[in-house]
A protein has these predicted regions:
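Surface-exposed peri-terminal alpha-helical interaction modules
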Residues: 5-283
Length: 283
């Protein structure tokens, strides 16, 4: 007859794990878990409203991290600290990948599920996300007309205006491009701070030099490809948004008053770093 050894259940007190937090900071204390978990306030009895809220709240948390990384990346780029700039851009790509994956969870909600609570949303819409707008502004997609929907929140409105008054991340990249290739910063007339960046022949000509001489300009080439990675994920994020909305509400108008899917499809045409895409046909 074999001796069967029975495993004792894990006992944290005998294994040295901290269990008394009366005078020490715990995991929940550090992360303010109680506060976070108390912020999901459903306005209906619909089961799927909780999913809808958590989808958007977690997206906002990840967008906060994107902004944290992009602002730091811009500061590093201003100092020409390319290794740290690259590191943070790589992280942004991974965050955008995570945001893309989240759409798969929301797509488990059917049209019938959504109609049970859609009317409780009022005029609230992702179109009004201050952080999403800030991300676009930092990348370089700057449309001052979009400020209007943020006037009711002065703090967000002022931060967006401040961002419009300074150079975007892509402007900083282009400035470095001109400095390396021409020995001087980009001419001011090429940079318009409060409008979307448009394809520019002078900028594209310089990127073409970089892409045709990768060995000589490896750092600029790597930086450019990091931006292409980011825009690739960003485009997929917007595309996933379009398909999820169309799958759930079809071509109804959005809760925020936009044309819904038609508006989102127009946003798919936006290019953040146009020269980096257009030059591929010139190589």
């Amino acid at each position: 007859q074999r001796n069967i050894m029975t495993k004792k259940p894990f006992n944290p007190t005998t294994d040295g794990a901290q269990t008394d937090f009366s005078k020490k900071m715990s995991y929940g204390d550090y992360l303010h878990i109680d506060t976070i978990l108390d912020q999901q306030h459903c306005l209906s009895e619909a089961h799927d409203e909780m999913l809808f809220i958590i989808q958007h709240q977690t997206s906002e948390l990840w967008m906060k991290q994107v902004l944290h990384e992009m602002k730091a990346a811009r500061r590093a780029l201003e100092l020409e600290d390319l290794p740290n700039t690259m590191k943070m851009l790589s992280r942004v790509s991974r965050i955008l990948e995570q945001l893309n994956n989240q759409w798969d969870v929301l797509r488990t909600m059917t049209p019938a599920d959504y109609t049970q609570f859609r009317d409780t949303l009022g005029m609230s819409s992702g179109f009004q996300s201050y952080q999403y707008r800030m991300i676009e502004y930092i990348f370089g997609n700057r449309n001052a007309n979009m400020l209007k929907s943020h006037e009711h929140t002065p703090d967000a409105y002022n931060k967006l205006k401040e961002e419009l008054a300074r150079t975007s991340f892509y402007d900083e990249v282009v400035g470095l491009l001109f400095k390396v290739l021409d020995g001087n910063s980009i001419k001011t007339p090429l940079l318009q701070l409060d409008v979307p960046h448009e394809p520019n022949a002078e900028i594209m000509a310089r990127w073409k030099i970089v892409y045709e001489n990768i060995g000589e300009y490896w750092s600029l080439y790597e930086l450019a490809e990091k931006l292409v990675d980011i825009e690739d994920y960003f485009r997929r994020w917007r595309f996933n948004h379009v398909t999820t909305v169309e799958r759930v509400i079809g071509f109804k108008r959005g809760t925020g008053g936009t044309s819904g899917v038609q508006y989102l499809r127009r946003m798919l045409e936006v290019e953040l770093f146009p020269e980096l895409w257009h030059l591929r046909g010139e190589l």
